[in-house]
């Protein structure tokens, strides 16, 4: 590994300081830091790299911040599948499981080829309007269809691999990966799914029926949701970061992505320990 991409929560002074130290550490070892352009502007005018160019150039990425910063970097890196080392400088750090104290020892191991990664399934989502695809994205966590603040419950006709599932009457719908199962889906009473599993979870948000419970599908399933509600404010949100307004008749197509996100694992803890310490899982 020669070229190391650096992403950080750009408006956080602590992240900026750690990024500056990391750049110096890499350069002292003859490595090439590729600093994302937005971050570079906060580091004394250092020349940065356009975000879209980084995946092609980098051999590895280091993300300084919280889970949101890592998720954003994962979507950007996409099909390149370079390993991502997430360093927790945020509040929760469920995905960014490497601590600041572990950063340089773990990075040394990565550079020598002695590291483990966990591969996380991603989803691709596209929106079809009047028979035409108007957008397409990849997500690591979830695809959310949600009503606006003043809208009534919405109708979402749903198919799985061409077979009718149901028409949800609810505040919204969450379609998540195993990684996303501990995010918004969990708050809506969705199941916790181990990240090594290959599946897609559909979780309704406040369904107007007692029988609409979350459902877990095999990963090869294709999910299509048609918005059937008129005159309501409805939005599509991807990983809680990218969004657009939906119109009646729009079809949202979701399927497993061809590529995965590769996260560098901490050798000092496992998934269940992270569940207990980060989410207080199993505590009374």
UniProtKB/Swiss-Prot annotation:
InterPro entries, alphabetized: ATP-NAD_kinase_N (IPR017438), ATP-NAD_kinase_PpnK-typ_C (IPR017437), NAD/diacylglycerol_kinase_sf (IPR016064), NADK (IPR002504)
This protein's name: NAD kinase
EC numbers for this chain: 2.7.1.23
Subcellular location: Cytoplasm
Necessary cofactors: a divalent metal cation
Pfam families noted in UniProt: NAD_kinase, NAD_kinase_C
Database matches in HAMAP family: NAD_kinase (MF_00361)
UniProt KW Nuclease keyword: no
Purpose of the protein: Involved in the regulation of the intracellular balance of NAD and NADP, and is a key enzyme in the biosynthesis of NADP. Catalyzes specifically the phosphorylation on 2'-hydroxyl of the adenosine moiety of NAD to yield NADP.
SUPFAM superfamilies: NAD kinase/diacylglycerol kinase-like
Residues where NAD(+) binds: 67-68, 141-142, 152, 169, 171, 182-187, 241
Disulfide-bonded cysteines: none
Keyword set, alphabetical order: ATP-binding, Cytoplasm, Kinase, NAD, NADP, Nucleotide-binding, Transferase
The family this protein is said to belong to: Belongs to the NAD kinase family.
């Amino acid at each position: 590994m020669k070229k190391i991409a650096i992403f950080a929560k750009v408006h956080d002074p602590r992240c900026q300081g750690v990024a500056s130290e990391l750049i110096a550490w890499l350069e002292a070892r003859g490595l090439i830091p590729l600093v994302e352009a937005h971050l570079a502007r906060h580091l004394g005018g250092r020349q940065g790299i356009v975000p879209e160019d980084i995946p092609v150039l980098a051999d590895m990425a280091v993300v300084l911040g919280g889970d949101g910063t890592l998720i954003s970097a994962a979507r950007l890196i996409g099909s390149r599948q370079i390993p991502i080392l997430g360093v927790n400088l945020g509040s929760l750090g469920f995905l960014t499981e490497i601590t600041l104290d572990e950063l340089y020892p773990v990075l040394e191991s990565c550079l020598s080829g002695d590291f483990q990664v966990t591969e996380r399934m991603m989803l691709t989502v596209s929106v079809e309007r009047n028979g035409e695809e108007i957008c397409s994205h990849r997500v690591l966590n979830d695809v959310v269809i949600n009503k606006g603040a003043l809208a009534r419950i919405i109708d979402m006709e749903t198919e799985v691999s061409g077979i009718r599932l149901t028409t949800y009457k609810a505040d919204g719908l969450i379609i998540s990966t195993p990684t996303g199962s501990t995010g918004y889906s969990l708050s809506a009473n969705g199941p916790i799914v181990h990240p090594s599993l290959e599946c897609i979870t559909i979780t309704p948000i406040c369904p107007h029926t007692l029988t609409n419970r979350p459902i877990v599908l095999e990963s090869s399933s294709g999910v299509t949701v048609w918005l059937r509600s008129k005159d309501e404010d409805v939005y599509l949100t991807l990983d809680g970061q990218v969004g657009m307004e939906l119109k009646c008749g729009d079809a949202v197509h979701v399927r497993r992505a061809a590529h995965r996100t590769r996260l560098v694992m901490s050798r000092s803890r496992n998934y269940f320990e992270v569940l207990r310490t980060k989410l207080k899982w199993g505590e009374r």
